[in-house]
């Protein structure tokens, strides 16, 4: 399955220097350099779960390595200075392109300071988030966003709508092919000698949108409600009963926001009396979200934005008693999962 690539290209006049591109990449802390390959980086949004890879041109990689070396020298003044680069990129006309038979220039990978590699077997918001990231990077670093490594002179770059439509079409084809050939299962390589079998899972567009809207707004909610002692939990994905479900964590008795997830990881404190002292233990387990909503809804603030959620501030004794009586499903019945292999379609793909 071919990866889907979004190119950030320099305009004919050259664009911003590599350091500006690097500053834009590192701006919000979601991009990290790959440990085993300095030419690759990874984007991950811990609030939404979106992720994708980036391939960096040598000019950006060298700027990154120079910055790391400068930080090391600051910590060790006796370290020798790095060698001077032989030649700086100036964006001029003397680039080493190999002309084709028509006299044009073959595009060089160095034309693209950054290439975003986006997975296909994911929900639509991955693409929307990657496209927004690319457009913001392009504005800051004076780059062009395109579906192609190079465009002919005078040709317009791909529009955001064209990129989105192309990705959606490629995603639908990949899902249909996977469903037809492998029954919706594929192997995910974790490293060179280990892979796991993953079954394709479908969420409704409404469920995917609610996940993304809540995750995108979680920090704003925390800024609003956190000073009042209300916890705003992060979302996570778990594999449970053969499919991937959404989950958040809650401690009964703690003021909190409760989004509409599939499951809630409940952590409740119990007192255990010993011979000489009483100690607190934490009991953990899973509860269907709908069960907790039915108990808390009448005593909580209901909000529809950014997605359906409860703001629960206090727990009257009768409500606390009902919460204490809830049966907890063993935590071992769920395990952490990536959102890779989870797609948002209107119906299940047919084999």
Predicted features along the sequence, with ranges:
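Acidic (Asp/Glu-rich) sequence patches and key acidic residues
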Residues: 1-351
